[in-house]
Amino acid sequence: MLTFMASDSEEEVCDERTSLMSAESPTPRSCQDGRQGLEDGESAAQWRSQESEEDHEEEDPDRYVCSGVPGRPPGLEEELTLKYGAKHVIMLFVPVTLCMIVVVATIKSVRFYTEKNGQLIYTPFSEDTPSVGQRLLNSVLNTLIMISVIVTMTIFLVVLYKYRCYKFIHGWLIMSSLMLLFLFTYIYLGEVLKTYNVAMDYPTLFLTVWNFGAVGMVCIHWKGPLVLQQAYLIMISALMALVFIKYLPEWSAWVILGAISVYDLVAVLCPKGPLRMLVETAQERNEPIFPALIYSSAMVWTVGMAKLDPSSQGALQLPYDPEMEEDSYDSFGEPSYPDVFEPPLPGYPGEELEEEEERGVKLGLGDFIFYSVLVGKAAATGSGDWNTTLACFVAILIGLCLTLLLLAVFKKALPALPISITFGLIFYFSTDNLVRPFMDTLASHQLYI
Amino acid sequence: MTLCAVESQLASGETARPGQAFFWLVSLLFSSLIWFTTATLIGNKDEPREKYLLIFGVLISVLIQEMFRFAYYKLLKKASEGLKTINPYEKAPSMRLLAYVSGLGFGIMSGVFSFVNTLSDSLGPGTVGIHGDPPQFFLYSAFMTLVITLLHVFWGIVFFDGCEKKKWYTLLVVLLSHLLVSALTLISPHYGLNLVLAYIIMVLMGVWAFFVSGGSCRSLKLCLLCQDKDFLLFNQRAR
C-alpha cells in the first residue's frame, strides 16, 4: 500500500485521504510512515503517539512487514503475525458492532421490519403450515432454492471475471448499489419517519435521498474519504440485512444461515470452490477484487498505480461477495466471500518489499450482512429479550476474533462466516431456551448471581 | 504456532475483555443448563421447591463463574508465557492489567445481563409497585448492578493476584464473598440492608485490590495532592 502512496502524486493523496493520512509523507523512515499510511484515521493517531516510544526499540526497519517475505528471520515473522492478529481484531470490531447496532436499533423501533409482508421469490414456500414437519420441510426447501441461487450467481460472477467481462461486472455492481442507495434508503427513511410521526415534504425528501445516494455512489465507486466510504458500506450492509430480516421467514432464516456457513467453508477452502478461484485469479492478475465492495479499514486506492503488486491488496484480505451488493431482489448473489486471506507475498524485488507495511484488514460486505441478519433475527424473534441479542453479539465477535487469529496463522483466504455463525446459532438457541427462563426467574425474585 | 497465536491475542489486553465476557456467557450457559435439567428432572412446580431450586441454581452459578474465572486466568497465563518465549524482549501486558480488564469484562457482561431487560421494561408504561411491591425497584436494581460490576472488577484483580502468588486462600475468600453477596440478595424485600452490606463488601474488596495492585497510602496521597510525577495532572501543573 505504501508503494503506491510513495509513487503517486502527493496532491491526490491530500485530496482523497483523510487529513491525518495525507499529512504523512513518505520519508525514508519507511516502516513508520508506511504503517501510518496504511491504517485508517483512528488508528493512525495511535501510531503517531506510539512512534516516539517505538523509535528506540526498532532496529529492524522491516519489523512490521508482512510476514513471509523472503529473507526475514522466522522469529520476526511469527511476531509480526501475532501483532497483526490482535490489532486487526480491534479494527474490525468497530464496524461490525456499528452495523449490528444500526440493525438492532431499527428492528426494535421500526415495526415495518418485523411485519410479515410477503416473501422473496427465492423462498417461495410459506411457513404458515399446520404441522411442524411440514414447516421444517418448507424451510429446508426454501434454503435449497436460496443456496442454489447463490451458487449460480457466484459461479456466474467467477466466469465473468475469468473471461474479463469487467464492464458487465461494473455495470452490475453500479446498478445494485444504485438500488440500495436510492430505493432502499427511501423506503427505510419513509418507515423511520412513519414510526416517529415526523412529517417531511417531498422536495426535502428528494434532496436528502439524492444527496445521500449521490455521495454514496461517488464514495463507494470512485474516490472519497476513507471514513465516509466505510460509513456508507456499513449503511448499505445494514439496509441489506434489514431486507433479509423482513423477507425471510423465521425457520428458513436460521436454516439459511447454517447452510450459508457450510457453503462458505466449501467455496473458500475447496480447491475448485468458486470463491477460491476468484481470489486466486485476482491474485494472479494482481488486481484487487472489486475494492468498492469490500470493507477495508485502510486505504485501498489503486488510483494512479501503474502496476499493482499483490502487496497492495492488503495483508489480511477478506474478500467479499460482490453479488451481495447486488440487489437483493433480482440478482442475489452469494453471501460473502467471507474470505479472509493474505495474498501471497510479493515476489517483487527490492525496495517495494521494504516498504510493505501493516495494512488494514478487509472483510467482505456479505459477512457484515449475515452477522447483522443473525443478530437482527435474534432481536426480532427472541421474545423481546435483550439477553439473547447480546449473547449472539458477543458470540459473533468472539468468532470473528478466532477467524482473524486463524488468518494470521494460515495466511490465506479463510471464510469468515462459519465460526461466527456457528457460535451465534449455538448461543441463540441455547440462550433463548435455557438462559432466558433462568434469568427471568432470577429477575422476578430479584436475585443476583 | 497456532497455540502461540491464540495466546498472544489473548495476552494483548485489547481482546482480553471480550474474551472474558465470552467466558462469563459460557459459564452462565452451563449453570442455566444445570438448573434447567434439574428443574425438569424434579418435575413439579410448587412454590417452595421452585425457590429451593433457584437457590441451588444461584449457588451453582457462582461456583461455575469462579471456575471460569480461574480457567481464563490459566489461559492468559499460558498466553503470556507463550508470548515471552517467542519474543523475550517485548513487553507483554502485565498480569495486573489483564486482571483488571478481565474483571471488567466479567462485570460488564454480568451487569448487562442482569439489568438490560429491566431497563427496557422501564421505558414502557406502568406504575412501579402498584400491587404492593416496593416502588424503588428500579433504583435498587440499578445500584445492585453497579455494585456487582465493581465487585467483579475487584474480584478479578484480587483473584489473579492470588493465583500469581499462589495464595490459594485468596481464591477461597473471593468465592465466599461472591456467595455472600448473592445470598444477600435472597433477602430481597429488605433493600436497604442488602445494598448497604453489598457496598461495604465492595469497599473492602476495593481497598484490598488497591493494595494488591501495588498502591499504598503514600501513593494515594501523592495522587490526590497532584504531586505524583506519573500522574497526568502533575504535568499540567508544572506548566
From Swiss-Prot, chain A:
Residues modified as Phosphoserine: S22, S25, S30, S52
PTM field: Phosphorylated on serine residues.
Active site (catalytic residues): D264, D367
Main location group: endoplasmic reticulum
Key words, A-Z: Endoplasmic reticulum, Golgi apparatus, Hydrolase, Membrane, Notch signaling pathway, Phosphoprotein, Protease, Transmembrane, Transmembrane helix
Location in the cell: Endoplasmic reticulum membrane; Golgi apparatus membrane
GO MF entry, a single one: aspartic endopeptidase activity, intramembrane cleaving
EC number(s) per entry: 3.4.23.-
Signal peptide: none
Function, in words: Probable catalytic subunit of the gamma-secretase complex, an endoprotease complex that catalyzes the intramembrane cleavage of integral membrane proteins such as Notch receptors and APP (amyloid-beta precursor protein). Requires the other members of the gamma-secretase complex to have a protease activity. May play a role in intracellular signaling and gene expression or in linking chromatin to the nuclear membrane. May function in the cytoplasmic partitioning of proteins.
Domain notes: The PAL motif is required for normal active site conformation.
PANTHER family attached to this UniProt entry: PRESENILIN (PTHR10202), PRESENILIN-2 (PTHR10202:SF24)
Family note: Belongs to the peptidase A22A family.
Protein's name according to its UniProt entry: Presenilin-2
Organism (species): Bos taurus (Bovine)
Organismal lineage: Eukaryota, Metazoa, Chordata, Craniata, Vertebrata
Gene: PSEN2
